[in-house]
Amino acid sequence: MSSPLSQLIADLSSADESKKLAAASEIYRLGRATAGSAVAGWWTESELSALLLGPSPAITVGVAVQRDTFSRIRIANGTPRLVGVPPDQDAEEFELEFPEGAALDILTAREPGGSGAIAKYLAKFGEGIQQVEYRCTNVDRASQILKEKFKVASVYPETRAGADGTRVNFFLVKSPDGGKVLIELYELPSRA
């Protein structure tokens, strides 16, 4: 028997467009809700809120899936372009955007049994919402505010290269239910 989230992930590869949209919308809602409760206090800090494009932040929910699921979802959605993930991250990714604002990144390990973050997540938890991504205008400054004012340490000591030339850092944030949520802050490449 599969979990409701497993069924939603499977429905992303449905030929029925309304079923696919309903699944994407629900996965997006679940990701936003999980992250929203974990980062609620961030919006009280005016500079951080502005850096994260508050009060209406650009949010993408990252869904980690096995390679076969990745292929099925990609084919069912018109074979979207693979984004350029740095090789050291051992991941493949494509983006899906749906009506009503649902944005998903579908992620998998580049190599079965790999050693990257996605492979480790899949080995430990199976398919699911792996991260929630917030677009940010300055990841370095946001990271500094999170460290100084919220005592939230970044996963990496420095901002690093992300997919398609973005700059990223990650934060493992405690949620009110005692769990943890992986938050990615990403900064779009400058148009030089």
What is the predicted function of each stretch?
Residues 114:
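Glycine-rich, mobile lid/loop segments that gate access to catalytic sites or pores
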Residues 65-81, 140-151:
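Amphipathic alpha-helical segments
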